[in-house]
Amino acid sequence: LKEYALAGEAMATNLIAQDSQVNQVDSLTEAWAKPLAQQTLNQAKVSIKIDDDASRFNVNNLYHDGKVDDTALAFFQALLQANGLSPNIAMAVLDWQDPDSDARADGGAEAAYYQSTGKKMAMGIANQPFISINELQQVRGMDNEGLQKLAPYLTAVPYYLPMNINTVKPELLTILVNLPTEANGNQPQGSNRADSDDNSQSGQD
């Protein structure tokens, strides 16, 4: 199975490389965004789907370059509310990734909080960017049900990644345009290179 997965990844990478030579603007009208014909490799059938990470909200946008991104925070809180979740979860998500041990007000949680709950955790609080959105299940106020609601709209890229206006999911665009003017200082951009193939499923690993 690994052999076929690697072959599919290689084909997806080649297609993205070809697209990069044509232009640096990703949109859903390009060849990579269209369903690819099923490939047969050694009598096995391989399906390939390429997705743009920038069509989702990157949870690591909340804290980057040593500070909180207020625009990203307002957006994430609105996304939480739109899915019936508490906006306070955003504070716990921030505390999970920032490097200090000071819990934020309104729902924040550092190592002391998790230790006090007696909750068994596979790892301690990360104090670094999220590696996978599955880590969110460990965060105060979040559970698997909440993650399933958010998963289609999230990704975890270890650097700042603005949403791509050409590929962003409609639900996220609706939230963006309804943000207060003072919070809407980080419009999504139209040129990003953060594509992934179907095997990585940027929304949820």
Stretch-by-stretch model annotation:
Residues 1-205:
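Compositionally biased linear targeting/interaction segments
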